[in-house]
Amino acid sequence: MHVPLGRKFDFDDGGCYVGGWEAGRAHGYGVCTGPGAQGEYSGCWAHGFESLGVFTGPGGHSYQGHWQQGKREGLGVERKSRWTYRGEWLGGLKGRSGVWESVSGLRYAGLWKDGFQDGYGTETYSDGGTYQGQWQAGKRHGYGVRQSVPYHQAALLRSPRRTSLDSGHSDPPTPPPPLPLPGDEGGSPASGSRGGFVLAGPGDADGASSRKRTPAAGGFFRRSLLLSGLRAGGRRSSLGSKRGSLRSEVSSEVGSTGPPGSEASGPPIPAPPALIEGSATEVYAGEWRADRRSGYGVSQRSNGLRYEGEWLGNRRHGYGRTTRPDGSREEGKYKRNRLVHGGRVRSLLPLALRRGKVKEKVDRAVEGARRAVSAARQRQEIAAARAADALLKAVAASSVAEKAVEAARMAKLIAQDLQPMLEAPGRRPRQDSGGSDTEPLDEDSPGVYENGLTPSEGSPELPSSPASSHQPWRAPPCRSPLPPGGNWGPFSSPKAWPEEWGGPGEQAEELAGYEAEDEAGMQGPGPRDGSPLLGGCSDSSGSLREEEGEDEESLPQLRAPGGSESEPVTTPVLRGLSSRGPDAGCLTEEFEEPAATERPAQPGAANPLVVGAVALLDLSLAFLFSQLLT
């Protein structure tokens, strides 16, 4: 297997990165572990950030999918001990569409926002019941439809404060129950009931659970009646007569369609309990607030029991109408699931007028409930469509998760291949803040994280660091890389050499000698292995040997003709970059190139041919003069 360019970093907090490396950042396949092997990301990296891979947390939970800028973004699958989410991710949180499933059978498919159900969605409960409608911040809120399963299949509710199966993955801790009020036994109509069944008739368990203690048994109501009898000193009626009159008023209210009696009229006569058939189902359509039936809505049971009107906290509360299976009705104002009539009657208005006002309010409530049903049915259709889209996203996320697992496998294989080659970390010089002195810097210092910190277990990141003031040398675009066998950088022009390497005196003469040798066809020393001395360049960041901190071999030195001492031409510098920079950990080969200084042109050495010609001309002139004289 071809092993690509890679790096290994051991962090101070115990984390470690082994994998691909490019341009000073993690790139390609790599594995990063947290402190003490608490959490691991393995997969693909792109310019210092995770792109596609698998993150495994210390508790065993995992995420498989896409990443962007160090956060979960795109499609992915998250698995924990008791639930799984498959779908889209946005900014590291669940959203916008996905499917959440629990080992108990609870499932939600729909829209998400900031990690919670928000928008339209369908929730299927462990017993098979469903809710389709609107959501807000992880709770049922808006318009929706709750459909139960047959009564004998419905899940038995454990908590009397919750009357339907809620989203166990999004519910906050349940606050303590409020103190019971006089006349309220402290239980909701679904206390001990089954999921989806909240409608209570006169003979249901709710009617039986709302019985008060009779005056004969003593208690609050007996004391209140005694005190009221003492206060009403002008009336010469006995306690027994009061008790009898109260019973007569309550007995006349049961089964009536008008508003007789008052709220404080005493305990109702318990009706014989009527068992719910095992095949009975119940459906509620209407408004929801904070995960409970609140507002206008209609609840109907398959045996004919029906309520239309106002709701509050999963109870009939406000004005509404109840229709019994036998066709009889009761209507009026409800409070905590019981029919009341606004306190003791003190006015002298005719009974028909008072009934007419209550009837008008009931009709308005029924009309509002029916409008709410229509709106809830529309939201139900939208929620079903969004759930179908979420299922498609879940399938796509599962496919991406498979690719992420394969990328993680490749990353671990490459890390295993790189591990033996990167066992011995090198040491490189690092300039301090003053830029004058150097100190050894271990190769295993962090090069991809800021301040030597590894990412948290939730989301491992390789953030982009600010650019370092010591940047690695890069070849100009016009130059081509060296062929195999050469690893030297280009030499600077003689005019650019600093003053301390030679001035216009002795060093200038030596330079003139070099130029004379070139004109005469003499060849200077070339680089080893037959590679050209000038024009080529090699990026030291592409060499594993240099990254591991091996020493550079010395370059050959040029000598002046006839001279015994060599003069330095140029020296490669291993530049150690700041560990806080994005290119930290890269050993780069740089050459000192100070500003060029212009030198006066020096006359070249005398040409032997010219000297010979001049000498011959002198001899010829001398011969001619001698002939003339003779």
From Swiss-Prot:
The UniProt regions of compositional bias labelled Low complexity, in chain numbering, are: 233-243, 455-469, 530-543
Q: Write out the transmembrane intervals.
A: 609-629
Region listing for Disordered, in residue ranges? 160-216, 233-278, 420-604
* Swiss-Prot/TrEMBL GO biological process terms: learning; neuromuscular process controlling balance; regulation of cytokine production; regulation of store-operated calcium entry; regulation of synaptic plasticity
Q: Is Transcription regulation there in the keyword field?
A: no
Q: What is its main location?
A: membrane
Tell me which UniProt keywords the record has, alphabetically. Cell membrane, Endoplasmic reticulum, Membrane, Repeat, Transmembrane, Transmembrane helix
- Read off the InterPro entries from this record: Junctophilin, MORN
Localization (cell):
Cell membrane; Endoplasmic reticulum membrane
Residue ranges, Cytoplasmic side:
1-608
Repeats (MORN): which ranges?
A: 17-39, 41-62, 63-84, 85-107, 108-130, 131-153, 284-306, 307-329
The membrane topology noted for this protein in its Swiss-Prot or TrEMBL record is: Peripheral membrane protein; Single-pass type IV membrane protein
Q: Compositional bias (Pro residues) spans?
A: 172-181, 474-484
The set of disulfide-linked cysteines is: none
Give the SUPFAM superfamilies listed for this entry: Histone H3 K4-specific methyltransferase SET7/9 N-terminal domain (SSF82185)
Q: Does the keyword Transferase apply?
A: no
Q: Name one GO cellular component term.
A: junctional membrane complex
**One family name in Pfam for this protein:** MORN
Family, per entry: Belongs to the junctophilin family.
Functionally, this protein is described as follows:
Junctophilins contribute to the formation of junctional membrane complexes (JMCs) which link the plasma membrane with the endoplasmic or sarcoplasmic reticulum in excitable cells. Provides a structural foundation for functional cross-talk between the cell surface and intracellular calcium release channels. JPH4 is brain-specific and appears to have an active role in certain neurons involved in motor coordination and memory.
Domain note for this entry? The MORN (membrane occupation and recognition nexus) repeats contribute to the plasma membrane binding, possibly by interacting with phospholipids.
What is the protein's given name?
Junctophilin-4
Which species is listed as the source? Rattus norvegicus (Rat)
Recorded name of the encoding gene = Jph4
